């Protein structure tokens, strides 16, 4: 389009420059007005100095200065093959170059040397499109040699994102200690710490004599406190190579205290290494299991919610229908305990355990509990699951408690609670298990806090007028235990240190049989049943979030369907390494 001026117009012929280049290329091919031959060994191609000098700072310096090449009829280009040089000359005269797996590396090197930045970036873009776990480490090194930041960034991103696959490649074993340390220590690394440890040991053993001295520094990059205790026990704690290093022994001993002690490490032992959070590649997901759906029979549905995308996803269904089972998460797995099995005309109280792996999207059978129970409560502490109270096979109210040791895969009886209650709120804080309220066999609210000292296996109880919750969950939010509703709108935050309650902002409705969990230091409440203003009971699909910073509630929309008596859990995982990918 012409540009209008006060005294006329400026005519712009947008095809003129490309036509001119095409004519110049025709002159080159016909060897008309060419004044220099660019050579690679015996191969040569006639060119125009003016065209080459206009195309790149490299040739401009060569032909417009007092270098001898400015006067020579033939110029040898050392280090560039004839095939690559021909591609460069073709680009100069046409603006086009064919990039393939076979020619991209020599072409990129030539573009860097001869200062053709657009060809260089085109080669970089092509290599980025070809990135895979099998070649990304090699391309990181190539990018460093060629000073190509965009390729290096993308190749390193692939190496970190697909680290387990990268760790299996031969290229990882060829890294120097500093390069490996940078990968293992990177917070963006997507891989379970077990895989990080295995990669480290494979690298050391590849050249044991030369690499043994780097073992301590590299072991410090592994976040041992997040390794599965069974893996630590079987494959790390007594590893002969690690035990041969006193420095590594000290690291393992600190890790052992962190992983296996009921108490956790002392403040003296709890150094910066053990305060590190999980890698940033881990995300929190909200999980809903079972319950009563749309006022129908007990469902086998398992739903997963991503706070990042706001999307719900269906996962593998529970193996059987279970009424009022309990569920917990431990070591990146979900455990569903007990409940009443619901099948054609038959209802049996179960001691069964089902374990779900999000990574595999599969259920498997676990070690059964000692006692069959439903309407019970469960919680976790370190490597243990506690299953508390409930209703037994004879429909009696149970005061018993049992504990599952996930390292030894055994259940064992523990001290029973002082007062048997149904539907209390349960949480663990500072090595104590708290039971708030609940109801007795006559469905009267029990105004008690029952406290279990985990390491001493003893209980005590405290009476309080603040407690009257029934069918309410409790969660640990910061330093407080928050009791969420229970035939009430009330939200109570309990401080175990001061033994005091603080009232938080009320929920919109009087709720019971709902779920609650914590993600990102916020409380999420799901479904349940609500008491209407005219005292009717309605099932709910509400999905709400409480922010303790502002003491406010916000709606997160609706659940996929109405749901109550369900489990509501937080599960941490690396999205692309699971069934979500």
Curated annotation (Swiss-Prot):
InterPro entries, per the entry: BACK, Beta-prop_ATRN-MKLN-like, BTB-kelch_protein, BTB/POZ_dom, Kelch-typ_b-propeller, Kelch_1, KLHL38_BACK, SKP1/BTB/POZ_sf
Keyword Repeat: yes
Signal peptide: none
Residue ranges of every copy of the BTB domain listed in the record: 34-101
Residue span, BACK domain: 136-237
Cited Gene3D superfamilies: 1.25.40.420, Kelch-type beta propeller (2.120.10.80), Potassium Channel Kv1.1, Chain A (3.30.710.10)
Keyword Heme among UniProt keywords: no
Name assigned to this protein: Kelch-like protein 38
Transmembrane segments: none
Keywords: Kelch repeat, Repeat
PANTHER family given in the database record: KELCH PROTEIN, KELCH-LIKE PROTEIN 38
Kelch repeats: 285-332, 334-383, 384-431, 433-479, 480-521, 523-573
